[in-house]
Amino acid sequence: MSGMRCPTCGFKNLLGSDVCDNCGSDLAGHDTPQSPTTFRGQLLGEHLDALGIAAPEIVDAGADVNDAIGRMHDKGIDCVLVTEDGRLVGIFTDRDAVVKVAGKPVAAGPIADLMTRDPVVLRHDETIAVAINKMAVGGFRHIPIVEDGRPTGVVTARDVFRHLVESLG
């Protein structure tokens, strides 16, 4: 006869028992098969600094949108953070360029007209789990990191994925 060992006292209970017959511990869910992956979620509790995020590319709100797109292309980056007096006021991503600019006659104009205003932000002391949650809930691929309202980095879905792959070995 097969049974389930209580994780608290080690007593062998009948399969399907919800409570240990020996110590009364809750057994619900302990007989669920575990995932065969070696990933155990350890990275979810890590702070964003573990991602090794580089300094962000920053442009002033009055910068020309075409110049910003050119910088993004030349540097091989997906977004720029937009500031006024050093404080984050928006983000402009490759998606913004494709959706708001591509195929439309865009004269030179300020990036502030096309950026996403007041983006969702993170702090360095927040965890990777918080970043993943904000990305999933908001449908974002880029979230600025700020310190006292000033941008210090950008977390990207690519950063999180790369870190996940590295942690799996």
Which residues are covered by each model-predicted region?
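Tandem CBS (Cystathionine beta-synthase) repeat/Bateman regulatory domains
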Residues: 1-169
